[in-house]
Amino acid sequence: MAKKQAPDSRPEIYVSTDVEADGPIPGPHSMLSFASVAMLADKTVLGTFSANLETLPGAAGHPVQVAWWKTQPDAWAACRRDLECPEDVMPRYVEWVESLPGKPVFIAFPAGFDFTWMFWYMMRFAGRSPFGWAALDIKTMGFALTGRPFRKSVKAAFPAHWHDPLPHTHIALDDAREQGALFCNMLAELRTRETRLAQLDATSIETSESDSSPPASQPD
């Protein structure tokens, strides 16, 4: 009989990840640069990983993305220096994630874009994903917290106190830090709301029990 494993009591580690690419999908196009910042819920940074990648053989930039990169000369220059081949980088990245002292959770804004790229590259060049199939989308979290329509759940519409004074430069490491701090602030608000609701529920139960108690007997 198989021995039952003890529950994993390690904390969740939020791996905020930003991808810079030259097109909408991997394969026909290439991931140019990516970065991850591993954070605890209180914004403690446990480590970072970043790399600039050589383009895929036979791939080419999408015309729309190529035109956009021409408007971002500093970010383009930053992601085209010290290039490494994906075959070397992705196994190293997966091992870095697996070495974190907790349960890694991939987070991004929007996760649908960044996780598509990272999952494809991890499976293609490392053969596994330390995140499984799952990613946490910060945009969806904002949609749930604000009650705004999903397509209007954009960073600019979020409350000012969710934003730390960090730059968003389209340089992967900068953007991973910025969105990671945003997520942690949103998570803190979620936890505060949960605590308040729990306190309200407890008060409601106490009031209900008090109202249903029989009246004290009167002396003869």
PLM regions: where:
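Acidic active-site catalytic centers that drive phospho-/nucleotidyl reactions
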Residues: 18-20, 114, 137, 175
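Glycine-rich, phosphate-binding/catalytic loops in enzymes
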Residues: 31-35, 122-126, 190
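Acidic, Mg2+-coordinating catalytic module of metal-dependent nucleases/exonucleases
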Residues: 105-111, 116-117, 154-220
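Residue-level signal for well-ordered alpha-helical scaffold segments within enzymatic catalytic domains
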Residues: 92-95, 99, 116, 120, ...
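Active-site-proximal helix-loop-helix substrate-binding element of RNase H-like nuclease domains
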Residues: 55-58, 66-70, 136-177
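Substrate-recognition/cap helix-loop segment adjacent to the acidic, metal-dependent catalytic center
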Residues: 97, 112-133
